[in-house]
Amino acid sequence: EAAIRDSDWVYLEGYLVTSPTGHTAALKTKALAEKYNVRTAVSFSDPGMVKFFRDNMAAMVEGGVELVFCNEAEAMEWGQCDHLDEAIDAIKAVARRFVITLGAQGAVSWDGENLHRVAAKPVEAVNTNGAGDMFAGAFLYALSRGESDLRATEFATLAAGEVVKYFGPRLDRDACLSLRRQFFGD
C-alpha cells in the first residue's frame, strides 16, 4: 500500500483482466490509487482482452481513469465501432486523457482539451513486439519530466519507432539514453 501511496502513477496492464487474481489485484490497486490521489493509467493491451474480457476491462476503467493507452484495433473494439472518431468518443467516456497508437501512422492523443495527431517517422520495422510497452513507458517518462501530453506523444512515437527496428521487445540502456539526448537534449 505504501508503494502506491508514494507513487505519482499506477500503470495497469489490460492482460490482468484474464485472471481472477490478476483482475482482483488490478481493482484493488486502482482503489488504493484513488484513495491516495494517485493517477491511474490503463493499457487495453490487446484487442482480445477488450473483446473477450469486456466486463472485466469495463470494471477496471469504471468511474474513469486518468489515462488509457491503446492501439487502433483496441480502440475500435472498445467503441464497438469501425471509425476512429467513434472510438475516441467511447474512450473519452472512461478516461480523462488517452493515447491511441496508429502503427506506422503515429498516434492520436487527447489531453482533456485538445486532440493531437503525431506522425511517425518512417522506419524499417522488423518486429513490433514491445512497441506498445515502449510507447507507454516513454509517454509516462516524458510526463514525469513535466512535459505536455503532446510532447509525451512525440517522444513516445519516436521511442516506439526505434524499438520496432530491432528484434526483441526493448532497447538497451545506451539506445534509451541516445533517444533521450536526441529528443530532450540531455
Regions found by a protein language model. Give the residues of each.
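Short amphipathic alpha-helix with an adjacent loop that forms part of the alpha/beta core around
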Residues: 1-5
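Short SAM/SAH-binding signature in class I
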Residues: 8-9, 136
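Conserved phosphate-binding/catalytic region of the ribokinase-like
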Residues: 31-35, 55, 59, 80-186
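Conserved beta-alpha-beta core of the PfkB/ribokinase-like small-molecule kinase fold
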Residues: 9-89, 105-106
